[in-house]
Regions:
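Conserved alpha/beta-domain cores
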Residues: 1-154
């Protein structure tokens, strides 16, 4: 997984360096390389990134910080650093849609699915393929997701 990849060209360079050191998808068809979707440019250029990578893992904490222009370590603005912000949700929905349309992997890591059950439901609704969870929320969230997936699609 490649973090903070700003451009598709930078992604190609990462893959070139990986291949130089023996991690080459052309030689190992089982090797999958994903890009972290943490920067608004990853969403805006999702198709171009998906031409380079096998999928995306959404880093919701960083994507929220960079979308809203926040210092998430500052106590002054932590109350507005929330993945449930409409602009952040719109970006997440867009990248999930693009990945699913292209048949590519898309998951999410970050606090939001653990902290907000309604956010986990949102992720199921938009077609997320996987989500990371804090250990103390796994069972509760798995039950919520299972119930949500049993419901008819709207």
């Amino acid at each position: 997984m490649i973090p903070f990849c700003r451009t598709p060209e930078e992604g190609k360079e990462c893959l070139r360096v990986m291949a130089e050191h023996g991690l080459d998808r052309a030689k190992d068809k089982t090797l999958k390389v994903y890009v972290m979707c943490e920067i608004p440019s990853n969403v805006l250029l999702a198709d171009e990134f998906l031409d380079v990578f096998d999928g995306m893992s959404i880093g919701s904490n960083d994507l929220t910080q960079l979308t809203l222009g926040l210092d998430r370590d500052s106590g002054i603005v932590t109350h507005i650093a929330n993945e449930k912000d409409p602009s952040v949700k719109k970006l997440i929905a867009e990248v999930v849609k693009k990945c699913n349309e292209r048949g590519k992997y898309v998951g999410i890591c970050g606090q939001a699915p653990s902290d907000y059950p309604d956010f986990a439901e949102f992720l199921v609704d938009i077609g997320i393929q996987s989500m990371s969870l804090n250990p103390d929320t796994v069972i509760k969230t798995l039950l919520l997701v299972a119930e949500k997936e049993r419901q008819p699609k709207k």
